[in-house]
Amino acid sequence: MGKGRVIFHVDMNSFYASVEMAYDPSLKGKAIAVAGSVKDRRGIVVTSSYEARAKGVRSPIPVWQALRKCPELILIPPNFDRYRSASQKIFSLLEEYTPLVEKVSIDEGYMDVTTTIKKVHPLELAKEIQQRILAEMDLPCSIGIAPNKFLAKMASDMKKPLGITVLRKRDIAEKLWSLPIEEMYGIGRRSVDTYKKYQLHTIGDLAKADPAWLEKKFGINGPRLHCRANGIDERPVDPEAVFHFKSVGNSTTLPEDTTNEGRLTDVLHQLSHSVHVRMKRKHVFCYGVQLTIRYDDRKTITRSRKLEHPIQEKDDIFTVALSLWKQAWNGRPIRLLGVTGYDVIDKKYAYEPLDLFRYEEQIKQATLAETISSIHKRYGKPIVAKGKDLDLFKEVDETKKGTSFDRDFFQHD
């Protein structure tokens, strides 16, 4: 690999399904899918085995549609305790080779093995890690090897299952630039049409575009993606990164202490909206909601609720926050309110028992929210909003953003 960094991206193959097959070997070689709401057939496929994918069963499609494509499909409800346990074992193994391991999600992570490879060739090291995970846990993975995180991520996607791919900077014109723009890590599915509208059909098109023009069209993300497309990514492998987003929270100090229920409900609604937007931007869902109330005498209380299914939508967050507030409020004037989504999980591993009767409605809501969020992100202020949110933007403009590292966010006075 020459001088410089050597980064691995370790990506487990069809992780949930693979864990289920390791737990029950009789499932191996069969078409299986992990899905929510298996019994009533109205759930969504979270992941599927490669045998099921060969029949067209891919996430996220409704269970009924998956069964139509593959009648012999074996449906398994998610067991997140089992998946978390397997994930912990995988990352413990990776940390045997280097302390520089960054957990991206439950089934993928980066390793900086620059020091480790002084003793062993990168390919041999990757083979050893891959074979150990398979032998000790019966779980397949693919590994990308590159001089930075972006190229390592792209490399790990090039050969699945059980692939090992090296991607050097000198190879990107040949191996990367011809790929369609939708295969580039960092470009969301809903953004693809926008890029194509500007004749950016391949990663190479993006790499050759003018950075200033990209910033004008796509905001600060344009030049960043331009660098990635040219193989430039200076981000370090950060073992602490996983702790940065244990929670996503917002709070606001009210203009004056109040007991006005309508006003307080409006504030909770806007805080829930803010948390939703930030969770969406970070591509996470939460398994719990916490409410913070600070009274006029500065006494602060917190109440929280763990959820059976992860949530991200504003209305879902608001419903839980409102319920917590009604249970906790003692009637005294309130000075501050805060809403936090905690125990977060990457959105691709979150599943909802989606009601198919509301499927089209939810898709429309998601598309509208995406459009509004992109405008806010670009211009830095709420120039567009849904009707019932408009006045709230004016009133709750001192919102404070908090994460698990903002230790004084919920400090009790």
Swiss-Prot record:
It catalyses: DNA(n) + a 2'-deoxyribonucleoside 5'-triphosphate = DNA(n+1) + diphosphate. Keywords: Cytoplasm, DNA damage, DNA repair, DNA replication, DNA-binding, DNA-directed DNA polymerase, Magnesium, Metal-binding, Mutator protein, Nucleotidyltransferase, Transferase. The active site is at 108. The record marks 16 as: Substrate discrimination. Its EC number is 2.7.7.7. Monomer. HAMAP family: DNApol_IV. This is DNA polymerase IV 1. The lineage of its organism: Bacteria, Bacillati, Bacillota, Bacilli, Bacillales.
